[in-house]
């Protein structure tokens, strides 16, 4: 069993404060829980196991047992997980507060050791000092933490995580924060704790301490779309659905500027217990709009695109063609439920086809052309250099004419009404008959930016904001967007 989990189970019986702070779902009776998908460490009980999604941030960081308490490291309520979570710059005083908290709730002294030994020896055949029976006394104080970066803020969730070499399918990575403190002083504090243990347990304590205090920090892990669960969506079939978030709060709202001070609250047991009595939950409906999700969707489109359409004579939009084996696209993917992506695909293909028909002689969708290679890349607008190269390749294929050192192409083929509206919006209310390279690039960019302006999007969804930030955004009515009314970013 996990050392931290065992320590919480046994130490919660010491006093009333510990009974409140160290209550873990992993040590309670199992209740029905969401299906676990990913391997990693539960931030609540620190054991390596199958993880399920958190209802506070949609990340996979909680085990099936601990999920019953719905605790998130971004909560406002100062439960144990939140008090172990630090943010951004950590100074020596912050670390001192964490160490003091550990000493308060996980003390190792002669009285505590004798109490646990007497409890164990009451059981049959437990007179030996086996590690399995005294695992809870072998919890060293280390500065081992799991770290994650969210929108420029770096979070460190301290704890004692066993089996660091096991599989990790989460965006968290291990860091050693011992450099933020005095290494020799931390050694001394742990040796003081170790001296109260029986000799048979001291070696194991020392091994655990040094293995978790002398390791090399891991490389930061990149986040991807699959790090976030879809289970918080109000309607999973609706790509514009809001995410339902639950956060644990207290009546005395706390300032994020004092984020690293939470662990010091436990120093005043009376006030801490009064504060925890005021705990309640807040619920928010939050838009899932962000660069991470948008890039994932546009990447899928770039792989599904049927470039043959740009040479076709079909009278239908690109997504509506059904009877042509070269142009028919598989529109059964869930991604096409999003009207924004349908508009982007149809408009982009309509515009490119108009350019091709206006400037070349090729007129059938069964043709095999070199320009096909660059069509999929025109949807990956966030890769600026690659996108510019693709637009340039397409433009050069149209055999532009140079006038006064500026190259132009024609645009005299029929456009859809919607695409004409996009061009008029960009070109001062007109649909010009000739376009320069900059004009073509501006129009193709606008087709995507009108709905997904990735240049100004936040990297991750708003759901990973702190509780105070969610509260402020909700007050200003900025947690939702206007896409349900088919309003674009520009509108």
UniProtKB/Swiss-Prot annotation:
Zinc-binding domain as annotated region, ranges: 42-79
Region (RNA-binding): 1-81
Recorded coiled-coil stretches: none
Pfam family, one: Rota_NS53
InterPro entries, alphabetized: Rotavirus_NSP1
Region (Interaction with host IRF3): 320-491
Keyword RNA-binding in record: yes
UniProt keyword RNA-binding, yes or no: yes
Annotated TM spans: none
GO-annotated molecular function: metal ion binding; RNA binding
Localization per record: Host cytoplasm, Host cytoskeleton
Single Gene Ontology BP annotation: symbiont-mediated suppression of host cytoplasmic pattern recognition receptor signaling pathway via inhibition of IRF7 activity
Renumbered residue ranges of the record's region Important for cytoskeleton localization: 82-176
Record keywords: Host cytoplasm, Host cytoskeleton, Host-virus interaction, Inhibition of host innate immune response by virus, Inhibition of host IRF3 by virus, Inhibition of host IRF7 by virus, Inhibition of host RLR pathway by virus, Interferon antiviral system evasion, Metal-binding, RNA-binding, Viral immunoevasion
Short motif pLxIS motif, span: 485-488
Gene Ontology CC annotation, any one: host cytoskeleton
Assembly and oligomerization: Interacts (via C-terminus) with host IRF3; this interaction leads to IRF3 degradation. Interacts with host IRF7; this interaction leads to IRF7 degradation. Interacts with host CUL1 and CUL3.
Functional description taken from the UniProt entry: Plays a role in the inhibition of host innate immunity by inducing the degradation of key host factors required to activate interferon production such as IRF3, IRF5 or IRF7. Associates with components of cullin RING ligases (CRLs) including CUL1 or CUL3, which are essential multisubunit ubiquitination complexes, to modulate their activities.
Family: Belongs to the rotavirus NSP1 family.
HAMAP family, per database record: ROTA_NSP1
Domain comment, as recorded: The integrity of the zinc-binding domain in NSP1 is important for degradation of host IRF3. The pLxIS motif targets host IRF3 for degradation; however phosphorylation of NSP1 pLxIS motif is not required for its activity.
Protein name: Non-structural protein 1
Species per Swiss-Prot/TrEMBL record: Rotavirus A (isolate RVA/Cow/United States/B223/1983/G10P8[11])
């Amino acid at each position: 069993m996990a050392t931290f989990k065992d320590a919480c189970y046994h130490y919660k019986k010491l006093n009333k404060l510990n009974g409140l702070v160290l209550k873990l779902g992993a040590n309670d009776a199992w209740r029905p829980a969401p299906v676990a998908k990913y391997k990693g460490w539960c931030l609540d009980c620190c054991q390596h196991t199958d993880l399920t999604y958190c209802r506070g941030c949609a990340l996979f960081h909680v085990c099936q047992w601990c999920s019953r308490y719905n605790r998130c490291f971004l909560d406002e309520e100062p439960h144990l997980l939140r008090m172990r979570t630090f943010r951004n710059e950590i100074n020596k005083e912050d670390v001192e507060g964490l160490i003091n908290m550990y000493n308060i709730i996980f003390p190792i002294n002669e009285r505590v050791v004798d109490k646990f030994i007497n409890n164990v020896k009451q059981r049959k055949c437990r007179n030996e000092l086996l590690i399995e029976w005294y695992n809870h006394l072998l919890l060293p104080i280390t500065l081992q933490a799991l770290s994650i970066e969210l929108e420029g803020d770096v979070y460190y969730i301290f704890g004692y995580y066993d089996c660091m070499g096991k599989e990790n399918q989460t965006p968290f990575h291990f860091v050693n924060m011992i450099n933020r403190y005095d290494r020799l002083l931390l050694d001394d504090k742990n040796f003081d704790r170790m001296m109260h243990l029986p000799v048979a347990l001291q070696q194991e304590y020392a091994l655990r301490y040094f293995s978790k205090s002398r390791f090399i920090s891991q490389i930061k892990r990149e986040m991807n779309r699959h790090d976030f669960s879809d289970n918080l969506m109000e309607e999973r079939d609706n790509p514009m659905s809001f995410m339902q978030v639950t956060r644990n709060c207290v009546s005395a709202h706390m300032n994020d500027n004092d984020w690293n001070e939470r662990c010091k609250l436990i120093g005043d047991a009376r006030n801490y217990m009064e504060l925890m009595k005021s705990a309640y939950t807040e619920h928010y409906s939050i838009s899932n709009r962000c660069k991470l999700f948008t890039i994932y969707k546009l990447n899928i489109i770039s792989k599904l695109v049927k470039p043959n359409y740009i040479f076709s004579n079909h009278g239908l939009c690109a997504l509506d063609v059904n009877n042509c084996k070269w142009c028919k696209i598989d529109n059964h993917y869930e991604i096409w439920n999003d009207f924004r992506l349908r508009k982007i695909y149809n408009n982009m293909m309509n515009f490119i086809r108009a350019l091709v028909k206006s400037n070349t002689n090729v007129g059938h969708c069964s043709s095999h052309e070199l320009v096909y290679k660059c069509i999929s890349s025109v949807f990956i607008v966030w890769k600026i250099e690659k996108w510019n190269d693709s637009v340039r390749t397409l433009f050069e294929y149209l055999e532009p004419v140079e006038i006064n050192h500026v190259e132009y192409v024609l645009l005299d083929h029929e456009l859809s009404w919607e695409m004409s509206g996009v061009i008029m919006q960009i070109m001062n209310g007109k649909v010009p008959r000739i376009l320069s390279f900059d004009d073509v690039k501006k129009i193709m960019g606008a087709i995507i930016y009108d709905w997904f302006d990735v240049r100004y999007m936040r990297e991750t969804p708003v759901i990973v904001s702190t509780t105070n930030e969610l509260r402020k955004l909700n007050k200003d009515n900025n947690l939702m967007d206007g896409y349900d009314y088919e309003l674009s970013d520009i509108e």
